C-alpha cells in the first residue's frame, strides 16, 4: 500500500520547484495522489477494509487542502499541477 523510496524520490525529482525542494505543495500533492491511487487499487480487492478507508479519506482531504492553498496563492501553478497529475478539479 505504501510507495517505495525510489518511487517517492522520482516523484520529488519530477515535481520539485528547485534542486533541494522536497516539501512544496506540488510535491506533497503528487505523493498523496500516488498513495491515494495505491489505496484505491487495494479497495478493489478488500472492500471491507474500513480502517484503511478512513486513512484514504484523510489523504483526500489533505490533498484538497493543499490544492486549495496553491489555488489561492497562484492559479497558474494550480492549473499546472492539475494538468500534470490528471486530476479532475
UniProtKB/Swiss-Prot annotation:
Top-rank lineage group of the source organism: Bacteria
InterPro entries (UniProt xref): Ribosomal_uS15 (IPR000589), Ribosomal_uS15_bac-type (IPR005290), uS15_NS1_RNA-bd_sf (IPR009068)
Pfam families named among the record's database cross-references: Ribosomal_S15
Disordered, as annotated region: 1-24
Keyword field contains RNA-binding: yes
Sequence ranges of Basic and acidic residues compositional bias: 1-20
GO molecular function: rRNA binding; structural constituent of ribosome
NCBIfam families, per database record: S15_bact (TIGR00952)
Function description: One of the primary rRNA binding proteins, it binds directly to 16S rRNA where it helps nucleate assembly of the platform of the 30S subunit by binding and bridging several RNA helices of the 16S rRNA. Forms an intersubunit bridge (bridge B4) with the 23S rRNA of the 50S subunit in the ribosome.
UniProt similarity note: Belongs to the universal ribosomal protein uS15 family.
Name used for this protein in its record: Small ribosomal subunit protein uS15
